[in-house]
Amino acid sequence: IRVSRYCANNQTVEVLVETWDNWSLLPKIDFSSEGGETDYSIGIADDNLLGSGNQIQLDYAKDNERTGYLVSFASPNIFGSHWNALTRYADNSDGESYHFTLTRPFYRLSSPWAFSLDMEKNREEISDYLLGDEVNLYERQLHWFESFVGFKLAELDNRIHRLNIGFTLNDTNFQQTDFTVFALPPDRNLSAIWLEYQLLVSDYRKLFNINQFNRVEDINLGWQARLRLGRLQAWLGADDSGWQLDAELAKTWQLNRDTFLLGNSRYQALWLSGTNQQLFSNQLQLVHQLTNNSSAVAIIN
């Protein structure tokens, strides 16, 4: 950045800003051998394709369970907008998967609305093992579609309230193979419509080496909470009527100048006729910045 011209009559200056792109094409080679089995993967990844900001990944991998390749393309801001997209395709010896996402997030605290569309189709073989030996093999197929629109409700001081309205198509079924020995798991369809409330207490800091190396990150030290309540719907394909609950709470604490504690708790529940399933998970991540280029991280799940 340098001053290129000074205008004395109005006491202003013209500033020339020069930017350049770093070479971001990274090759990937991974090789290992254990117990007479050789695993390897090769590929390339570029986080700034031709200076466009788009990301591409090409991988080919082989291990003792499968062989396959992966192609992924992501655009974090399509044509300079606040929309972002991800397209990914994987073809493996035991199945294949497609994934597409189109999102306009709440890209700033004052954003009035958001939108998301997420589609996934996946087919894979599942193996059951006993004492290290494969004893059963069957196929699982997943069809997933989720979309929602979100609205900002209110902003009081540094507290932002939001409401998301959406639906999820979630259909999983199982198929026999020539090596299926045991009974298949039951097919399930948990398609639902839902409402989600979000609370964000804004206390953002620009930090370094927290979740990513050599990048400045906007980390929120305020509380973040969300509560989603869904109702399973037969007209969407659900097997049964029932309710879904998904609640999450997150917070980051700065213990001292170089030490941070990131906490996340989540509760999930599914209520069907005669069925009650609940899951609680918790994660703590302790980050201590050693230097400007390195951090020590400890994670407890």
What name fits each language-model region?
Residues 18-20, 33, 48, 64, ...:
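A broad, low-specificity signal for short, low-complexity segments enriched in glycine/proline
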Residues 24-33, 40-42, 46-48, 52-63, ...:
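Transmembrane beta-strand segments that form the barrel wall of outer-membrane beta-barrel proteins
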Residues 9, 25, 37, 55, ...:
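A generic structural micro-environment signature
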Residues 50-51, 79-80, 255-257, 289-295:
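Secondary-structure transition/capping motifs at alpha-helix termini
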Residues 281-285, 295-301:
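Active-site gating/interface segments in enzymes
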Residues 90-285:
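Transmembrane beta-strand segments of outer-membrane beta-barrel domains in Gram-negative
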Residues 1, 80-81:
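Short secondary-structure junctions
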Residues 1-33, 37, 43-46, 59-61, ...:
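Periplasmic polypeptide-binding modules associated with outer-membrane biogenesis and secretion
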